[in-house]
Curated annotation (Swiss-Prot):
Lineage: Eukaryota, Viridiplantae, Streptophyta, Embryophyta, Tracheophyta
Record-level Gene Ontology MF annotations: RNA binding
Pfam family for this entry, one: Intron_maturas2
One Gene Ontology cellular component annotation held by this UniProt entry: chloroplast
Gene name as annotated: matK
Keywords, comma-separated and alphabetical: Chloroplast, mRNA processing, Plastid, RNA-binding, tRNA processing
Protein name: Maturase K
Keyword Plastid annotated: yes
Described purpose of this protein according to its UniProt entry: Usually encoded in the trnK tRNA gene intron. Probably assists in splicing its own and other chloroplast group II introns.
Record localization: Plastid, Chloroplast
InterPro entries to which the protein is assigned, alphabetical: Domain_X, Maturase_MatK, Maturase_MatK_N
GO biological process: mRNA processing; RNA splicing; tRNA processing
Length: 513
């Protein structure tokens, strides 16, 4: 406990106050582009309808508000309140997006400063490979072979927006900033008097991705902090989706309060966290909790997580959101892969003097494959094929040049191969490649009002090279001296790339579902 209190005091010394007036000054653009915070990369804000807004637009909008005397909450002049004027949907949607996303930039500044001020964080850039999404799978392969049971956890959304604000109060002591945050959240919840809480959350998630991502990560970190803080030494992975928000200031205070309010429940369940064979992995709203214990222990874990979230975090977790499975008898979907731990049987021939023996050996193997049906469904939603996987043309791209069309299709194919390079079965990837290649040919044929055969003959090897993936280049060098080697389904080698820090747009819907 003394160690935790010392840790808490250390975190308090790093706490930063918000510079609230910065949101309403034109210097926010330069401040958000500070090299010490974000490096040399420009800050991009993704709005709804796949529109991109940079912080430069935030700067221009704030200047325009000064010039035209715009006010966020005008009482005397309600006609000038274009942010809350629901009759003008364009102003209401556009201004709320720009201001809320700009506010999200300012909201992230104290957390970025706290991360940079930590002495031990200076060593992290040397281990940037651990931030890769693919670094999770070698960890699972190393640990899951020795485990028995797996729990799938779906982290629920908060019941009310006020819970999000209260969670941030542990780190944010600037009252005006919290009031401004409440204004944005109430704006979405009061858009329609008949709208439900879940629809309000969906609207916030769709139109203000940066602000929602920050709030949701803060919310999820509260859900998992008690578990991750005590079990942090069991894994060296730093998930970028929640790594910034793992530390809490009032952890020791909340643990003391929890021990006073529920002393018996707290003491009985605390020893579960010290199990060295308990492993936890999360990305976005889905988490995996695996252990070597018995089924009874896993059921106790499930009961504990439900009660812990209800009494300690003030929100209700439905028991069906936590599913228990045995690792060897089930598969699980995580990060766009379908993973399983099957038991393979091998016959080993042993010889002792003149006698031969056949020994049946059973061995576990961590297997990852690319799910065919969900990926084809994702291509179907993107209008590259039908629901059954038949390639179709992309009419919206017919206005582009031929090389732009080839480049887009080839880039999508390479991204899919790059992300799913860890799949042990390549048949699904080559099926996706066939769909994209034929869809590209049909798009070009539709543009020039010709046939697919004509374009395939005219482009020849150039058309095939655009879809020649990096993985095939690697294997062609490895097996250059092999005469009977074929790419299509003849190898099961898996490659994990440690430079993947984000998920492809075609794969991301598989993770959210």
């Amino acid at each position: 406990m003394e160690k935790l209190e010392g840790y808490s005091e250390k975190q308090k010394s790093r706490q930063q106050y918000f510079v609230y007036p910065l949101l309403f000054q034109e210097y926010i653009y330069a401040f958000a582009h500070d090299y010490g915070l974000k490096g040399s990369e420009p800050v991009e804000i993704f709005g709804c309808n796949n529109k991109k807004f940079s912080s430069l637009l935030v700067k221009r909008l704030i200047i325009r508000m000064y010039q035209q005397n715009f006010r966020i909450n005008s009482v005397n002049h309600p006609n000038q309140d274009r942010l809350l004027d629901h009759s003008n949907h364009f102003y209401s949607e556009f201004y709320s997006q720009i201001l809320s996303e700009g506010f999200a930039i300012v909201l992230e500044i104290p957390f970025s400063l706290g991360e940079l001020s930590c002495p031990e964080e200076k060593e992290i850039p040397k281990f940037q490979n651990l931030q890769s999404i693919h670094s999770i799978f070698p960890f699972l392969e190393d640990k899951f072979l020795h485990l028995h049971y797996l729990s799938h956890i779906e982290i629920p959304y908060p019941i009310h927006f006020e819970i999000l604000v209260q969670l941030l109060e542990y780190r944010i002591q600037d009252v005006p900033s919290l009031h401004l945050l409440r204004f944005f959240l109430n704006y979405y919840s009061n858009w329609n008097s008949l709208i439900t809480s879940m629809k309000s959350i969906f609207l916030l998630k769709k139109e203000n991705k940066r602000l929602f991502r920050f709030l949701y990560n803060s919310y999820v970190s509260e859900y998992e902090f008690f578990l991750l803080f005590l079990r942090k030494q069991s894994s060296c992975l730093r998930l970028i989706s929640s790594g910034t928000f793992l530390e809490r200031i009032h952890f020791s205070m909340k643990m003391e309060h929890f021990g006073v309010m529920y002393p018996g429940f707290f003491r009985k369940t605390l020893w579960f966290f010290m199990d060295p064979l308990m492993h936890y992995v999360r990305y976005q709203g889905k988490a995996i909790l695996a252990s070597k214990g018995t089924l009874l222990l896993k059921k106790k874990w499930k009961s504990y997580l439900v009660n812990f979230s209800q009494y300690f975090l003030s929100f209700w977790t439905q028991p069906q959101r936590i599913r228990l499975n045995q690792l060897t008898n089930s598969c699980f979907d995580f990060l766009g892969y379908r993973s399983s731990v099957p038991i393979n049987t091998f016959l080993v021939r042993n010889q002792m003097l003149e006698n031969f023996f056949l020994i049946d050996t059973r061995m576990k193997k961590f297997d990852t494959t690319a799910p065919a049906t969900p990926l084809i469904g994702s291509l179907s939603k993107a209008q590259f094929c039908t629901g059954l996987g038949h390639p179709i043309s992309k009419p919206i791209w017919t206005d582009l040049s031929d090389w732009d069309i080839l480049d887009r299709f080839g880039r999508i194919c390479r991204n899919l191969f790059h992300y799913h390079s860890g799949s042990s079965k390549k048949q699904t990837l080559y099926q996706l490649k066939y769909i994209l290649r034929l869809s590209c040919a049909r798009t070009l044929a539709r543009k020039h009002k010709s046939t697919v055969r004509t374009f395939m003959q005219r482009l020849g090897s150039v058309f095939l090279e655009e879809f020649f993936t990096e993985e095939e280049q690697v294997f062609s060098l490895m097996f250059a001296k092999t005469t009977h080697f074929s790419f299509h389904g003849s190898h099961s080698e898996r490659i994990w790339y440690l430079d993947i820090i984000r998920i492809d747009d075609l794969v991301n819907p598989l993770i959210l579902n």
